[in-house]
Amino acid sequence: SSIIKDAIKDSYKRLIFPSIEREIRSDLTILANKVAIDNFSSNVSNLLLTPPMKEIRVLGFDPAFRTGCKLAVLDKNGSVLSIDKIYPHEPHNKIKESEIKIVELVNKYNIDVIAIGNGTASRESERFIANTIKNNSLNCKYVIVSEAGASVYSASDLAIKEFPNLDVAERSAISIGRRLQDPLSELVKIDPKSIGVGLYQHDLKQKELDEALDFAVGSVVNSVGVNINTASPSLLKYISGLNSKTIASIIKEKERINKFTSRMELKKILSDKVFEQSIGFIRINDAVNI
């Protein structure tokens, strides 16, 4: 009858179809969220696995216009040797003075590579550095480095604790330089969501994203391993079996003896279980048994 047909049409249009549509949309959203998180994790892993440039002296260059370009001279181990600032761009245009300062730093500290951040004024800074190297026949090269997340790290409690006497921009120049020397050690200090290699993170389920990214970072760190003599607490916290208490014990012991020469020395400060869980991911580069 027409009443039954009308009832069927109404129920399909008003109840059944919207319900099916919501269910399909929900399934697709869940799938899209999973794919996006997997993509985010994969990108983070690939970035962290960028090969380090060991044994090079770096000049970290954080470009800017009005506030000036911040410079950080780093030795082969990433230790800060000098901090400076130049104003080669608008509105100052102190090109000659800036060029003299770059030449002075490169020659004084035997700089191998100048790491230029890819943010504001990056193109102008690249042109300035290229001309400076060419005009003065400097024996160094320059590289453009992603500075995504550098500002986040520079303003963090970790950065303030590490460099309490420097301002945010100066810490950023240090971070840019260290990213070239050892990307893994530097990038683990930054929340993976701030590195800028995935979709807009606030569109994704935060708990699932945090867990996936934490797992990705931990997997990379344990896959590569860490040099116990140079690793920061930010890096050590991802090593299987270690926690804040054991990390503090390792750092205290390292400060006491200056450097570890054998992994067996860790047995003095780690329990048998923790030693068993963590030792496979710890390296001592100049030891007989790495």
PLM region spans:
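Gly/Thr-rich phosphate-binding beta-strand-loop-beta motif of the actin/hexokinase/Hsp70
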Residues: 52-80, 180, 271
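Non-catalytic alpha-helical coupling and interface elements of nucleotide-dependent molecular machines
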Residues: 17, 49, 111, 134, ...
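Short coil/turn segments at secondary-structure boundaries
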Residues: 19-28, 56, 60, 117, ...
